[in-house]
A protein has these predicted regions:
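Helix-to-beta-strand junctions that scaffold the AdoMet/dcAdoMet cofactor pocket
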Residues: 2-4
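Gly/Ser/Thr-rich helix-start
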Residues: 6-7, 91
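Conserved class I S-adenosyl-L-methionine
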Residues: 7-35
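A conserved pocket-lining segment of Rossmann-fold NAD(P)-dependent short-chain dehydrogenase/reductase
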Residues: 34-42
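Conserved Class I S-adenosyl-L-methionine
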Residues: 42-140
């Protein structure tokens, strides 16, 4: 229960164009696998990655003075396959979508993600832009 004057904050990944790892993963699934794998319908994963729907949702639920900002972050990996492994084991919906692919599709998805991540090699590391966004507001 949030008291009057209390603050709420919600964070989600930024859009797939800016959150390169998420964008690469979902582009690879669409290109080499299937998003239709029998999971229950869910909202658009990136629905709240932009200011308007985020602040409107906060206002619609009774909050005031909504703000929205990007939180820059970079994931650093030593191996271009680390991002795929993290998504396959450290997420919920993306991992379930990956587990439901055929072995051939999974391999093609892994290779496509590796290729996308390889473009972000900096010396001995891969620096993958993975910004999030935070929407916040105040309970009247």
């Amino acid at each position: 229960m949030l008291k009057p004057g209390g603050h709420v904050a919600v964070s989600v990944w930024d859009s797939p164009e800016r959150s390169v790892g998420m964008g690469a993963l979902y582009a690879a699934i669409r290109a080499h696998g299937s998003m239709d794998v029998g999971l229950p319908a869910g909202p658009n994963f990136f629905l709240f990655s932009s200011a308007e729907p985020s602040t409107e949702a906060l206002r619609a639920t009774g909050f005031e003075s909504p703000t929205f900002r990007q939180v820059p972050q970079v994931w650093r990996h030593l191996d271009p396959d680390q991002l795929f492994a993290m998504m396959a084991t450290g997420t919920v919906r993306a991992a379930a979508t990956l587990r439901a692919q055929t072995p051939r599709a999974t391999q093609a998805i892994r290779e496509a993600v590796r290729e996308a991540i390889s473009a972000h090699r900096r010396g001995d590391e891969y620096e993958v832009p993975m910004p999030a966004v935070v929407a916040a507001a105040v309970k009247p």
